[in-house]
Design a protein with these regions (language model features):
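Generic structural signal for well-ordered alpha-helical scaffold segments
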Residues: 14, 45-49, 142
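Short, glycine- and charge-enriched coil/turn segments that flank and shape catalytic ligand pockets
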Residues: 14-24, 52-55, 116-119
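Non-catalytic substrate-recognition/targeting regions of SAM-dependent transferases
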Residues: 1-34
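Conserved SAM/SAH cofactor-binding pocket of Class I
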Residues: 31-114, 118
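Structural signal for conserved beta-strand scaffold positions within catalytic alpha/beta enzyme cores
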Residues: 9-11, 26, 60, 111, ...
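S-adenosylmethionine
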Residues: 79, 85-191
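Structural motif
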Residues: 6-8, 23-25, 57, 79, ...
């Protein structure tokens, strides 16, 4: 599944594929969210391509299958951290990291609550989760985001846009880019 300009998502059961010069993300989504076919995942991956550099430290909030954090590493990020409240998601993300050649030296995963488990600051924070979770967590994200970092949020159905934008704004974020696909939204945000 080609995504953006640089990535090709290859479900592990697909034997025949041509990378076409793209970074290949080998993925077994299991029961965790993030197979690469959903609009929100594609929107996030396309946004990540713009911001990942060799110095990027990335945080994946609600990491699911690990698709966003593993893709960030494939795009050249220095390190990635994933956190999810679902232990199965964390296990799946770890397996997908290993499947793509990333061990604990570059890819760290935590099971539990964002604020209980994570410390430090990141250049890119991505959260492809439901609107209610974005609204709830956005007040916490600022302390994990570098001042010049980017907060990529998706999982937002268009009918919830105003509510999410208001929450982001009240938490000190401004939307620098709005992307839409099939009624789903992704915002690229910076600190105000």
């Amino acid at each position: 599944i080609p995504v953006g300009e640089k990535l090709l998502i290859r479900p592990v059961w697909e034997e025949d594929f041509e990378s076409g010069g793209r970074a290949v993300l080998n993925l077994e989504p299991g029961l965790a969210f993030g197979s690469g076919t959903h609009e929100t995942t594609r929107l996030c991956l396309t946004a990540l391509e713009k911001y990942i550099t060799p110095e990027t430290r990335m945080l994946d909030v609600g990491c699911g299958s690990g698709i966003l954090s593993v893709a960030s590493l494939l795009l050249g990020a220095k390190s990635a951290v994933g956190v999810d409240i679902d232990p199965l998601a964390v296990k799946t993300a770890a397996e997908n990291g290993e499947r793509n050649g990333f061990g604990e030296d570059k890819y760290t995963l935590y099971h539990g609550n964002l604020t209980d488990k994570i410390s430090g600051r990141f250049d890119v924070v991505a959260a492809n989760i439901v609107a209610d979770a974005i609204i709830m967590l956005s007040s916490q994200i600022g302390r994990f985001l570098e001042d010049d970092g980017v907060y990529i949020v998706s999982g937002i159905i268009d009918t919830r846009e105003a509510e999410v934008v208001e929450a982001l704004s009240s938490c000190g974020f401004k939307t620098v880019k709005r992307n839409e696909d099939g009624g789903w939204l992704c915002f690229e945000c910076k600190k105000q």
